[in-house]
């Protein structure tokens, strides 16, 4: 017998705010969403700050959003967890950090600290680097090198120079640490197997190959002079003595896993074959668990399990579910949605649609949305699934480029696809929910008119199609209990989210 699915459509990076010259959501032609808002119950959800387990006022992101949606509870995130440990002193007792630093003392080797140098809070926080530098000083380490990955996505595209300058000042004030390399996250933090990019980052950090400039602040200024902003800055070697070698210790201070895996695997995995390189042993600390299969690493902050999240709970009830997205957001509807667990539950099917191979997504704002849409509708029509979780990546990934017209096109593409998926779901007698994990495309311009590439703290929509009811405002953690509610199922006690349906 065909199943009538409950379909959750996540429009990644689609926030709500008033119309304006930089609002790609309001500038776009969105006949499908306009119709859904007019015809069905809808409300707004908080997707940032304390409501998703982040510090107050901190913008949400895809990892956090999907973890909260899938968990059906506010999941305390790595950023406040680590920051709190700095405040209470337990950070400096961390076993993995201590092992890395003690190995340097014992072997007379170097300590390398690398990660995203910004206060964006999505992948890392500069204050965590400063705490590691302080810890290295406390332990009497002298050979300490910082490899700075510039951001330009979660913060202003030209804020990198100030962060590099601040980092250099901090090293000088502490009397420990030198900036050895500087490069854009485009190279060091790829997540799409673009090994030619990762190799440039690797070659700079390990072999000292790349542009040479002893002044890291000037290196960033030179990049700006060439019209290359932080994210895309080519790797620059500032201190040729600061290369990574045998028996050195490395602490990768990013806590978000998805963009930390590739460069980590290149260094720690003897079987790595993404590009030619010699393998050598290091003491390597991943700030969090980047991948359960990663060999030869220590994990500083092991994951706190999210028990009985939506995926696990549906599976335990013998129900079927589909997760579908293109490459850029596949980890989010699987790994993050399942609470940071790679495990695929019984009854859970997954469909990965490759993202287009373009340098930046403003060049193809449609991305692979229509292919995701087509494959999803095929699966809906199969009648095989009780629940379908679907992500459209466009508003977020194109929003990050800062190109307004491309973001408008992205919104319009998502609008078309959402309309088709909702229609297919309702045709099967199912219920469709349309929401987002955080904002982005609704603010494409800074107040001064320059491009805005970061996420926002704006509310996100929630539309319930196919169930005549009244909804209350809520937060992302309330989505899973709402899904269970419309299916006539009680939420497990671990979920502290509440149904959005007004009883």
Annotate each predicted stretch with a short phrase.
Residues 1-503:
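Feature captures the catalytic ectodomains and active-site-proximal regions of enzymes
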